[in-house]
């Protein structure tokens, strides 16, 4: 497989067959997949998530049925769930949102659905709650990297854990550390970079020694590039890619923090915050908002953030409205394409 390529050039990932078998077994146990299960592969199957978490491999291993989706689109996904009596499927947040919008105009019998897995990018708590209510299912958050590590929530977890965390590692042999910029371990509930080693995580990319020198530690931990923290109950929260963190005149801004506040505004249904190159500050803050009934000015957005106690250095420099989000092949919002619109 190739790495996602959302923050750089895709890299070849040397994975073993036994890695995929191991992950499929562990994730089928987490999802209670059995011979009665019907899995809908709604995302492109050349990715870890629909391929084997538990996905196609895990469902077949348990004797269940797999349904393939020709196009990742609500007018393909929702009819298939109804016709094939799908019990489990996986979405990225953007696709989940699009499907829910579609359900406002079209009706389908989705009563067979038991579990919806959501992964691929950060899932905001309000959207997690909405998914459970609209689809009347138990949500399973899943965080994974093509290079190995998989975290998931459990069906028995309470609402707060399912909506606000990405759960725990699937293997008792996964070794996870949260470290600062100097590689020192941070305390519980402190943010840092998630690094990992374990039975199904790679020890380097294929034929890229210069890259491996920067992404593998001396004691063989893989640097995921994800900003995260470990909670007291052992669950993990992932807040985004470290490369997505905006460095504005030396101040660090996490996009998710601003996005969560902006989504509480009555006229904002979907938003992305990205950093743009700036000669004076290094990076400036841009807010992209999906077109709705009313457009807000930059001044209105800034005033709203100030009313929510956002510090001055985190206030955006520009606001731009957009008709539709540019998506990667896996359905993630393509932040690089957003930057190219300026």
Model-assigned labels for residue ranges:
Residues 86-91, 100-161, 171, 175:
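Gly/Ser/Thr-rich phosphate-binding loop
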Residues 21-38, 48-88, 102:
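Conserved AMP-binding/adenylation subdomain of ANL enzymes
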Residues 2-6, 39, 81, 89, ...:
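Conserved S/T- and glycine-rich ATP-binding loop of Class I adenylate-forming
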Residues 1-22:
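Conserved AMP-binding A3 loop
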Residues 169-173, 184-215, 253:
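Conserved ATP/PPi-binding loop(s) of AMP-dependent carboxylate-activating enzymes
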Residues 112, 136, 172, 267-270, ...:
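Glycine-centered tight turns that cap/initiate beta-strands
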């Amino acid at each position: 497989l190739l790495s996602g390529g959302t923050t750089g050039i895709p890299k070849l990932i040397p994975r073993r067959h036994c890695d995929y078998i191991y992950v499929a077994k562990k994730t089928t146990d987490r999802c209670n997949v059995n011979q009665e299960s019907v899995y809908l592969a709604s995302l492109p199957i050349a990715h870890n998530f629909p391929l084997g978490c538990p996905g196609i491999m895990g469902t077949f291993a348990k004797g269940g049925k797999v349904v393939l989706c020709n196009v990742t689109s609500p007018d393909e996904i929702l009819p298939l769930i109804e016709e094939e009596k799908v019990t489990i499927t996986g979405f990225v947040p953007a696709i989940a949102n699009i499907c829910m919008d579609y359900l406002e105009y079209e009706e389908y019998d989705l009563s067979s659905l038991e579990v919806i897995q959501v992964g691929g990018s950060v899932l905001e708590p309000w959207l997690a709650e909405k998914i459970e209510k609209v689809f009347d299912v138990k949500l399973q958050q899943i965080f994974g990297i093509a290079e190995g590590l998989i975290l998931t929530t459990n069906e028995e977890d309470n609402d707060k854990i399912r909506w606000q965390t990405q759960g725990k590692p699937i293997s008792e042999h996964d070794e996870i550390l949260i470290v600062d910029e100097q590689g020192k371990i941070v305390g519980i509930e402190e943010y840092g970079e998630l690094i990992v080693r374990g039975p199904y995580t790679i020890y380097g990319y294929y034929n890229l020694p210069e890259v491996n020198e920067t992404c593998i530690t001396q004691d063989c931990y893989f640097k995921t590039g994800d900003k995260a923290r470990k909670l007291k109950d052992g669950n993990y929260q992932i807040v985004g890619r470290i490369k997505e963190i905006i460095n504005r005149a030396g101040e660090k801004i996490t996009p998710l923090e601003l996005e969560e506040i902006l989504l509480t505004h009555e006229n904002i249904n979907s938003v992305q915050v990205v950093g743009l190159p700036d000669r004076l500050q290094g990076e400036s803050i841009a807010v992209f908002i999906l077109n709705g009934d009313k457009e807000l000015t930059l001044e209105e957005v800034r005033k709203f953030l100030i009313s929510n106690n956002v510090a001055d250095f985190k206030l955006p420099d520009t606001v731009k409205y957009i008709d539709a989000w540019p998506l990667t092949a896996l359905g993630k919002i393509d932040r690089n394409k957003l930057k190219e619109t300026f």
